[in-house]
Amino acid sequence: MAREYSLLNTRNIGIMAHIDAGKTTTTERILFHTGKIHKIGETHEGASQMDWMAQEQERGITITSAATTAFWKNTRFNIIDTPGHVDFTVEVERSLRVLDGAVAVLDGQSGVEPQTETVWRQATNYKVPRIVFVNKMDKTGADFIYSVKTIGDRLGAKAAPIQLPIGAEENFTGIIDLVEMKAYEFDGKPEENYKEIEIPTNLLEQAKELRAHLVEVAVEYDEELLMKFLDGGEISISELKSAIRKGVINADFFPVLAGSAFKNKGVKLLLDAVVDYLPSPLDIPSIKGILPTGEEVERHADDTEPFSALAFKVMTDPFVGKLTFFRVYSGILTKGSYVLNSTKQQKERVGRILQMHANNRTEIEEVYSGDIATAVGLKNTTTGDTLCDEKGEIILESMVFPEPVIQLALEPKTKADQEKMSIALSKLAEEDPTFRTYTDDETGQTIIAGMGELHLDIIVDRMKREFNVATNVGAPQVSYRETIKLPGKAEGKYIKQSGGRGSYGHVVIEFEPNKDKGFEWVDKITGGRVSKEYINSARVGLENALRNGVIAGYPMIDVKATIVDGSMHEVDSNEMAYKIAASMALKEASKKMNPVVLEPIMNVEVTVPDEYYGDVMGNISSKRGIIEGSEQRGNAQTIKSKVPLTEMFGYATELRSFTQGRGNYTMIFSHYAEAPKAIADEIIKKSGK
């Protein structure tokens, strides 16, 4: 099957925004105009095409990046809809990783909002070219020029309008195209027809000034044009478009458009801008990867190169099973073929290849370089894995996901729920690399851990809706740890005689702190005093005991254990006895080793307008935080600090209240550190150990 659309006519784009900026509605309109939807779904009615999970429709927010393919003016779009809530930044991260460009949607009344800053920073990290769509121009208080200004002030980004709205609020009727100096009036119907009109006289001067500024900014990206401009030459429309495109592809310049997706105004012109200014897979740098020899190589968007792709999302579909979304960087993949998962060194068979539209799908025979598709049949592939040709093995740069920072206990309501719950949790953990689940050895409770309270709410909700599992949910908890500060040596001897065959296990173990190196086991038994089998049992027993700690019931980390002596009984020795003996040795030695409670310390980055800088610094210090520095970004300050997680519960609400919603923060696990005595005593008391 031949390639239907050339690489030049392919756009892999994301739609990114603050929650409630109208991103999903904008995506809806794009899908409507590109022929994928016959009836438009309104987000505020809970009927959107992209928001296909039940909770998304109920809450009116986008949680999962739904990938969809659409077509516009001989160009094929692969669109990824990204969530706008801070608990789902991992979804944004993984979609940005595989995109070539993005449309940033702003609210015409608010301009750049806190979550816009978070998502914008992530896009900047991945050097994603962007165009900006100022949406909701029909809204009361909408102000296009103010919104453009916030891009420079709050994001420190170089932006300039390429359109000027005609009117605002209920009088928003059309736009002036500043590149071609033409004006268009919208009819406001779903088909979004528009007609060319004269540029209104009251806006002509402003339009000329904005165009002159646009030309000045754009020619900087083309040396020949800059010389022509400085010599007083006239810059043609095609030259201006080409210069704007260069600035956009450099991820250095961000053209701004205006519209109202809800009122069917400006979305078709936005689609034209995606084609004109956002990059094709050929415009972006080739991807780097590592060969089995360790040598770094590049793979290009070329069908003749060996196949290489990155899995960026895994989902469970109730009808098809496991779906793996992947971006092809080089080569071609045919359905039914075998690929190598080079990250896990496992061979996988691609059963079917699907092209997705929200939650509908079309089966295709082949997928080409530069494209995004979904595979059915990959059993062991997870998010961030590289898929490649067996003969052209390569590992592409993967995605790094933050550790979960919040956990809570789940209990199934009935016996039937118990069985379904473990299946549901393993499937959900497979989909989401920032979600973990395990069983607490002491209480037997199932613990789930994730990125925030909303994140875990959604997980519990999905279990109920998709897997029909009813649960009782505990309060959120911090994941503490324990460690030792001094070395210690102890004997563990377990002898049990109860008529007939007894039990005998005897070990001597030396313990010492092993900072930042995890658990280490060393065998120094000589002369066969304890057999290898029982030494291994002692190790297993010790690891089990460490999982439950010695002072507060939390896992003990960073311990080196050396087994130095022991003995065996020719009849009564058994594996269980050595497991118990090792745990007895730990308990005994802990009396000398000064065990302590460790608490998780988070890297917290808070970005706030300058006027709130002092308040935030004081607030962080009051939370036992250590300020590591700050940097100016536009008219905002980003404060970097390390803060104990215990102090961060409810921080989103706190920050919102004293910055009027203009502050935002990111929080990622840094390390474990010893908890102050008063806090440790409280934790130990609560544990009842």
UniProtKB/Swiss-Prot annotation:
Keyword field: Cytoplasm, Elongation factor, GTP-binding, Nucleotide-binding, Protein biosynthesis
Gene Ontology biological process terms in this record: ribosome disassembly
Record bears the keyword Nucleus: no
Keyword Nucleotide-binding included in the entry's annotation: yes
InterPro entries: EF-G-like_DII (IPR053905), EFG_II (IPR041095), EFG_III (IPR009022), EFG_III/V (IPR035647), EFG_IV (IPR047872), EFG_V (IPR035649), EFG_V-like (IPR000640), G_TR_CS (IPR031157)
Database matches in HAMAP family: EF_G_EF_2_B
NCBIfam families listed in its UniProt record: EF-G, PRK12740.1-5, small_GTP
Protein name (database record): Elongation factor G
Source organism of this protein record: Mycoplasma mycoides subsp. mycoides SC (strain CCUG 32753 / NCTC 10114 / PG1)
Native organism taxonomy: Bacteria, Bacillati, Mycoplasmatota, Mollicutes, Mycoplasmataceae
